[in-house]
């Protein structure tokens, strides 16, 4: 007779529970460690933050440079404008508007694109392709939202349902660019971003670029989608990671750079076929160019993710070899070796850029 205890202990379900328990214990350990910092260390860190605030702050004035990101316990308080604050159409839009309340009511239920069109059809200020700009003030940033895409038709409407109202409350000028990969090659998220950048710049003199995964839903409208003096990592606390930063150099999900910054780092690498590694390479490029990375304070950077488990996409096994040569490749692989042929169509809420990507379109010379 089979020992029932042996069968139970070897069950994949039990193994999964054990792994989940160990991860939760590790996460709790991290939280305990962070909360055990001494008062002296906190005071010292606040002094250093204050000394560096002017040099490293972005236009949002509420973020912190990565090299000072040791704890969020002692962050400066962000003040938002009162409800009765008056601003004028010929003045720059404030960055901390009364309309930005903080937590967003997240609705992850599936919705068709037709329903999204109907939802925003009564807003005449949204132009073809999803272009919008405020009329009651001058937007501080002209923001191109670039979304890499393949077979996520149920995710895009959910994202737009949340992002459009949020960006309108933030009084940013914006438009959406959905960059869709077709063909048989593995998904190349980074190359799609490069294509989206090139196409977006043909439409308008954008000054801020947001690189946004379609399955990341922001939980706070105070996560201001403008750019700054440093590249910005917006999605710092993702629910599937228990709202913890997976590792210090994590730069995935949602990030933002000015056009000047993006050109200086030569964009994303084109050589990452399959998922994984391209965000780490972007981090390296940012550091190699002499930039730090800013992040939202507190819980402002919280996001919910739509589960998908990289359906149909393969993991890029060669990413570590490429990452070891990030610095050598940076000037050879990116915007400057990009070639593509795009098919452009317009939706009421976004511009669709369809490309069939192959490695031959971004060949790299020897380094």
Language model regions located:
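N- and C-terminal low-complexity/disordered segments
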Residues: 1-57, 184, 217
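Acidic, Ser/Thr-rich intrinsically disordered and amphipathic helical segments
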Residues: 13-20, 92, 115, 144, ...
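C-terminal catalytic/acceptor-binding lobe
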Residues: 16, 20, 40-46, 58-93, ...
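A short, compositionally biased domain-edge/stem linker segment
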Residues: 123-135
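Short, acidic, metal-binding catalytic loop of nucleotide-sugar glycosyltransferases
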Residues: 134-140, 152, 159-173
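Hydrophobic targeting segments
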Residues: 141-147, 163, 175-178, 196
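Conserved catalytic core of nucleotide-sugar-dependent glycosyltransferases
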Residues: 184, 188-192, 197-199, 208-212, ...
């Amino acid at each position: 007779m089979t020992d029932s205890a042996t069968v139970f202990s070897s069950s994949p379900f039990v193994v999964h529970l054990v792994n989940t328990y160990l991860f939760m214990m590790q996460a709790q350990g991290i939280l305990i460690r962070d909360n055990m910092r001494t008062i002296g260390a906190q005071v010292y860190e606040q002094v250093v933050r204050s000394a560096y605030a002017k040099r490293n702050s972005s236009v949002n004035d509420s973020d912190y440079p990565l090299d000072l990101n040791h704890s969020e316990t002692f962050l400066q308080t962000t003040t938002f404008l009162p409800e009765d604050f008056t601003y004028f159409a010929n003045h720059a839009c404030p960055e901390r508007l009364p309309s930005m309340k903080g937590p967003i009511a997240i609705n992850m239920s599936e919705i068709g694109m037709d329903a999204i069109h109907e939802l925003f059809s009564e807003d005449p200020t949204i132009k073809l392709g999803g272009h919008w700009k405020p009329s009651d003030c001058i937007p501080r940033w002209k923001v191109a939202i670039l979304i890499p895409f393949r077979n996520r038709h149920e995710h895009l409407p959910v994202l737009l349902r949340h992002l459009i109202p949020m960006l309108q409350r933030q009084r940013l000028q914006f438009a959406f660019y959905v960059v869709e990969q077709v063909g048989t090659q593995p998904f190349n998220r980074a190359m799609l971003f490069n294509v989206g950048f090139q196409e977006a710049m043909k439409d308008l003199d954008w000054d801020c670029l947001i690189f946004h995964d379609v399955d990341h839903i922001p939980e706070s409208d105070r996560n201001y989608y403008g750019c700054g003096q440093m590249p910005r990592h917006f999605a710092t606390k993702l629910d599937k990671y228990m709202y913890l930063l997976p590792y210090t150099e994590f730069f995935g999900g949602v990030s933002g750079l000015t056009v000047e910054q993006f050109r200086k780092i030569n964009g994303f690498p084109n050589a990452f076929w399959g998922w994984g590694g391209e965000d780490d390479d972007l981090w390296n490029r940012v550091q190699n160019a002499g930039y730090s990375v800013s992040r939202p304070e507190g819980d402002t950077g919280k996001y919910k993710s739509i589960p998908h488990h990289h359906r149909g996409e393969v993991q890029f096994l060669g990413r570590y070899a490429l990452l070891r040569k990030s610095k050598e490749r940076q000037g050879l692989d990116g915007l400057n070796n990009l070639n593509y042929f795009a098919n452009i169509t317009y939706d009421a809420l976004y511009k669709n850029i369809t490309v069939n990507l192959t490695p031959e379109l971004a060949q790299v010379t020897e380094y």
